[in-house]
Amino acid sequence: MNDIQVAKESLDKIIKKARVHLYKPIQIAEILYQDRVNKNINLLDKETYRNISKKWRDVICIRFLGRVSTSSAKYQDDLFNDNAMPPKHLNILGEMNRKTNGGVESYIYKKFFERFNQMSSALEYSYSRTPDNFHLSEFLALFWLEPGLKRSIDKVYEIVVYALFSSLIEALGVKVKIDLDLSNIDLLKEFEDFTRQIISLDSENTSLELNAKINRVGVTNASDRGLDMWANFGMAIQIKHLSLTEELAENIVSSVSSDRIVIVCKESEEKLILSLLNQIGWRSKIQSIITEADLIKWYDKALRGKSAYLVGSKILEHIRNEINLEFPATDIVDFNHFFHEREYNKALDIEK
């Protein structure tokens, strides 16, 4: 391959690997836009755009996604590594972009719009279905079978787990009770301002009852480790649908400071996860391992079982609300205005 083909292939790999929000491809597009229009950077010198390009990217992301990347600075800077988009490749794309009047930028934003059209089609399932005809296996398959959406399947898993767990706990009326040990009354009186402000208890109010709740952390974790959900009754939940290594298993458990961890995984991963956890001595910290088959069974009962009237609609409501937060819809009219405002419709096609 020649240099142009290598640079283009690097770009395509980044687009293919990107989650639905396409943060890194958008950052590349905005670097190329600044180079083409304002001519205020040197593509061979990444220090002229490494940090400022995150701000350029964020302007676009806020406009069309309503959010910005929450990944670590190191992970974001990995964009310019030799195995991603090093300056020499970016410089080649810049030259091609100028010759085609923004053709590379146009190519990236077309991919962005295609990805969101794919997402819209998949998400329409959750809006058009009722408890009678919503099937979890069908919903997940929409993401597994679409290459452009497969990278976002982890967030979809989080959403369906959260929707089920939180709906059942709410419908069951689970309560959490907190009591102060009155044998430590002297300590309580000394730190009564602390207990009153932090745990809403004092010497006159020594117990508190709360509704049990599960909360999503809701922040994309680039390295796929750590906490996905937590409960106010001491449980931590880690969603794990990808292949698990011994190192990753140890990272998952050691990065969550709870001794009641619930892991959700595919059936094919269950034995491997148990084996790895036993090898590293962390099995005792795992409260339970739940498989996709368990989720499908529970969804069928919750949506169409004897008690479906108590939880069915609530589950779908949670799914829709979380999807809106995780995958905000792009305004098609605004995007088309942006596309024509930059005259990407007049740019030459880099694939011809």
From Swiss-Prot:
Reactions catalysed: Endonucleolytic cleavage of DNA to give specific double-stranded fragments with terminal 5'-phosphates
MF terms (GO), sorted A to Z: type II site-specific deoxyribonuclease activity
Enzyme class: hydrolase
InterPro entries: Restrct_endonuc_II_HaeII
Lineage: Bacteria, Pseudomonadati, Pseudomonadota, Gammaproteobacteria, Pasteurellales
Domain of life where this protein originates: Bacteria
Protein name: Type II restriction enzyme HaeII
A Gene Ontology BP annotation from the UniProt entry: DNA restriction-modification system
Enzyme Commission code: 3.1.21.4
Key words of the record: Endonuclease, Hydrolase, Nuclease, Restriction system
